[in-house]
Amino acid sequence: MAGALKATIADSRGMNVLLILNDGPYGTERSYNGLRLALSLAKTTDTSVRVFLMADAVACAKTGQTTPEGYYNIGRMLKGLTSKGIEIGTCGSCMDARGYSDADLDAGICRSSMAQLAAWTLEADKVVTF
């Protein structure tokens, strides 16, 4: 089984992957699991990863998140991705609807748009939605 997994990962090099997150940072683990996948994909050679936050997932990009000790921190996970050069966009309309401004976003995360999501989707070899 492990050999098959390694072969699959080796075959996926050179791919462009877009992850779209929809759920808020805490409550369900969908965004958490999407970011876990993004971090794992970021470790593979020649794989380009982008993350787009929309709907309640725009709250994942909120600066200054504090969680109890031992609990996962979505903000830290996003910082781990941006430190690797991974592009993270947030739906501007979704931000506006929830009262978020650009100043609310962690460093390296940018307000984006449906036009940007459309472009990223067309450039992606695979799109995964959480």
Predicted regions and their residues:
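Histidine-anchored nucleotide/phosphate-binding helix
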Residues: 31-44, 51
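C-terminal structural segments of small proteins and small subunits
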Residues: 97-130
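Short, Lys/Arg-enriched N-terminal segments with co-localized hydrophobic residues
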Residues: 2-14
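Short, active-site-adjacent cap segments at secondary-structure transitions
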Residues: 58-61, 96-98
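Short glycine-enriched, charge-decorated loop/helix-capping segments at active-site entrances
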Residues: 64-69, 105-107
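Short internal beta-strands
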Residues: 38, 48-55, 88-92
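Short, glycine-rich nucleotide/cofactor-binding loops
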Residues: 18-32, 61-66
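A glycine-rich helix N-cap at a beta->alpha junction
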Residues: 67-94
